[in-house]
Curated annotation (Swiss-Prot):
GO MF annotation, one: tRNA binding
UniProt-listed Gene3D superfamilies: 1.10.8.50, 30s ribosomal protein s13, domain 2
Protein role: Located at the top of the head of the 30S subunit, it contacts several helices of the 16S rRNA. In the 70S ribosome it contacts the 23S rRNA (bridge B1a) and protein L5 of the 50S subunit (bridge B1b), connecting the 2 subunits; these bridges are implicated in subunit movement. Contacts the tRNAs in the A and P-sites.
Taxonomic classification: Bacteria, Pseudomonadati, Pseudomonadota, Alphaproteobacteria, Hyphomicrobiales
Name by which UniProt lists this protein: Small ribosomal subunit protein uS13
GO biological process: translation
Database matches in PANTHER family: 30S RIBOSOMAL PROTEIN S13/40S RIBOSOMAL PROTEIN S18, SMALL RIBOSOMAL SUBUNIT PROTEIN US13M
Key word Ribosomal protein present: yes
Region listing for Disordered, in residue ranges: 99-122
Keyword RNA-binding recorded: yes
PROSITE patterns hit by this protein: RIBOSOMAL_S13_1, RIBOSOMAL_S13_2
The organism of origin for this protein: Rhodopseudomonas palustris (strain BisB5)
GO cellular component: cytosol; small ribosomal subunit
């Protein structure tokens, strides 16, 4: 099992699919990495040589922000918005949708489970 960017890559999958197990690498980035390293698209991870795995590691380390670094940067960006006190920061702080979605109904994923409100007594 190859280990790239701190992630165990599944050995029986194609390299294009296996690279997407790394946080921060999607379809497009995986295809770009394969193209840079000049690996055939249909090659599987267990067919890669150690030199090819090393080349993939070098390309990812040099050109892409992945895993912990990406998560840290995303968290820092959200924290910066909250510290600024801008509208987006306030929405993050309150746990509400940030990008203008309606909240009268829906938005349950972001707001959490519905809180029961006592009904009118007769």
């Amino acid at each position: 099992m190859a280990r790239i960017a701190g992630v165990n890559i599944p050995t029986n999958k194609r390299v294009l699919i296996a690279l997407q197990y790394i946080h921060g690498i999607g379809q497009k980035n995986a295809a770009d990495i394969i193209e840079k390293v000049k690996i055939p698209v249909d090659r599987r991870v267990n067919q890669l040589s150690d030199a090819e795995v090393l080349q993939i590691r070098e390309v990812i380390d040099r050109d892409y922000l992945v895993e912990g670094d990406l998560r840290r940067e995303t968290g820092m960006n959200i924290k910066r918005l909250m510290d600024l006190g801008c509208y987006r920061g306030l929405r993050h702080r309150r746990g509400l949708p940030v990008r203008g979605q309606r909240t009268h109904t829906n938005a349950r994923t972001r707001k959490g489970p519905a809180k029961a409100i006592a009904g009118k007594k007769k």
